[in-house]
Amino acid sequence: QGRSESSGAGQEQAREADSGKGQDEGQEASKGASDTKIITDHAGNQVEIPNQVNRVVVTDIFPIPSIITVLLGSGEKVVGMNPASMSAARTGLLGELFPDILNAGTDFMNGSDINMEELMKLEPDVVIYSAGSKELGEALRAAGFAAVGISVNKWDYDSIETYDQWIALLSEIFPEKEDTAERVSQYSHKVYEDIQGRVAGLREEERKSILFLFNYSDTTW
């Protein structure tokens, strides 16, 4: 009888241990699942990213680092960007208003080529690339990065709609700034409507022709 009671007690302890282990594993799995989320980028890819993104690298979309910085009110989370974006930040207002953006790394890029080893050293939570650069996106994913494609032409180069879609996707990456994203979008629409209202009454001969240089140097523009 003593052996039977001892055996029964041992089995009960084993069941309790297994139950406790199962609960722990379930809690860990639940915790792990809650640490990430799935978003859909502009290339239609479903991308798993951390709920809290603290380090982001932008590869081949030059304006995005400045938009992220203004959206967040800081350039601290932009840890890497294209050298062209850095050049604009250094020579323009962005670097003056948000000097922390100047700490971002650029050594991972050489022209259009990306050094994956140098990119890994930046330890990005998310890497943003042009959604039209399909091969780059595949290479980033193959290297283990959470690669999010942002499009520059999906909305037929409608600047207002494109900007709205950029802000919408960035607010999924940085949900803590969703309210700010909404205000930014509203402001851009207001500016557009104000300008349209001012020029609506102009006759065709009164309208001015404009040449907009998006890139200029002594030899190219």
Where are these regions (language model features)?
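Short, low-complexity disordered leader/linker segments with a strong preference
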Residues: Q1-Q52
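Extracytoplasmic
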Residues: S34, H42-G44, N51-N54, G73, ...
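Extracytoplasmic substrate-binding proteins
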Residues: I39, Q46, L136-T220
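Conserved H-X4-D acyltransferase segment
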Residues: A43-L72, Y216
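A structural signal for short loop-to-beta-strand junctions that line the ligand-binding cleft
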Residues: V47, L93, D100-D113, I150-D164
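Structural recognition of the beta-strand scaffold that forms the well-ordered cores
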Residues: R55-T59, V79-N82, V126-S130, A147-S151, ...
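A short, structured surface patch at a secondary-structure boundary
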Residues: V58-L122, V126
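Solvent-exposed loop/turn segments at secondary-structure junctions
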Residues: F62-P65, A84-S87, V126-V127, G132-L136, ...
